[in-house]
Amino acid sequence: MTDTGIFYGTGAAEGVPSPFCDCPMCNYAREHGGKDVRKRSCFRLGRNIMIDMGPDIFTQALQYGSMCDIEHVLITHTHDDHFNFTALGLMSMATHLRTTPVHFYLSEEGYRFIELLRDSEIAFGGTLRGMEKKGIYAFHKLKYFETYSIGEYEVTPIRGNHGGNMAKERSANYVLKAKDGTKMLYGMDTGLYEEETLDFMKNQNLDIWISECTFGNLKLQEEWNTHLCCLLYTSPSPRD
């Protein structure tokens, strides 16, 4: 598993450099480019699985190549920087349309967002249902802590501590188990996990843990409990 993952984007919602920010970090990224530029969050696992599909999908495809092999997209939550539904329209604009759909997976509350889009003129003039019927893509509802067979992996969504576009939505972080037994947690977006999730994770015996540090070196504050900071991993008391 370690040699099949590619980070297409590791930035927060505003990316780096942020379009409307002239802080030293953003200005440095504009000047130097390269690794200091961060596109919005997206991770590709192997040939056909992707985690999140945000607003930088066009640029990411330019940099990393065709996405025609993608068959499964695990959505962590419905914020635009992780699930940019307008990207769905790109799949219907291909000269050679797919013969099998791209499968999108969301939490139960995240799936409600899809149900709203199906009946909304905002989503391609109300044609989302029609594109589903044509087999361009399909949407699936996942329950937290239940395991599903997706592609070549066993996938278990766990409850994150981060909202989405729906009022009661909480992010889905994903535990993925490969055929060789290697187990990985893709843990973003989230704040500090709640007890239910911590209890589930106690016996998972992870080999790889991918997490976030949105707040960098800032001290973790209670009101920020939707993201994490670097001090969480380096200090026994990240709020001190």
Map each language-model feature to its residues:
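Core dinuclear metal-dependent hydrolase active-site scaffold
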Residues: 1-64, 139-197
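Conserved small/polar residues in nucleotide/adenosyl-binding loops
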Residues: 233-240
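Short, glycine/acidic-enriched loop or turn micro-motifs at the edges of active sites
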Residues: 55, 80, 191-192, 215, ...
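Active-site metal-binding motif and surrounding structural segment of the metallo-beta-lactamase
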Residues: 48, 53-105, 206-209
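Structured loop/turn residues at beta-strand edges in well-structured enzyme cores
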Residues: 68, 100, 135, 153, ...
